[in-house]
Every structure is written in structure tokens, then in C-alpha cells.
Amino acid sequence: MKNINWSGYEWLTQERWGQYHPSKDFCYYDPKAVSIDENQKLTLKTHFNPKTFKGKKINVGVGLISCVEKFSYGYFEIEAKLPKGKNLWPAFWMWSFESWPPEVDIFEGYT
């Protein structure tokens, strides 16, 4: 697991339970698909990088960040180049740290 520091907070580059989500078995969360440049611009990518999880080969690694810390306010901006292909799920979500509802969808698409 790779943690990053960005915008004054600590972020995971995978979900809290790990790199692989059994109900989303078409991709896994890959720390190599997350980068921050010298201007603090965050880039999340999707790339072909096969790995095996619990005996199942998954070909696509995706970038994801999830904040370790709780915060209440902030400014978020997205500029997106959406991927083409089958079984892709580009999204920009804000998740609740401890309460319901679990997420706010800023943008979500599924192919």
C-alpha cells in the first residue's frame, strides 16, 4: 500500500480493505496509476498492468485516492479525459467518513 500526502492530508491509493474489490472484478486499485506533479496536480490513470487476486487475473489497474483523515470543507475541481472501452467506471465521488449517505456523486459514468 502506498500513502501519499496531498493538499495537507494523507491519502490511501487504494480502498481501506485493499487493492481488490470482489464485486468490481474488472479492475484493481494500483498505486502506480496515481501521481502528483511539482505543481501539486493529481493525476489518476487507467492502464493495462495484469495482476492476480485470489486466483483471478485482473488486467486493468486504476488510480484511486481515499483520504485517511476527516475534513469538512474544501474546493475540488476535475478536468477529465474519459476512457473508452468496456467495463470502465470513471467517477468523482466524495464519501462520508462515518455516516449516511455514504457518497455524493460529482460525476459518474459506466460503460
Give residue spans per PLM region:
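GH16 jelly-roll
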Residues: 1-111
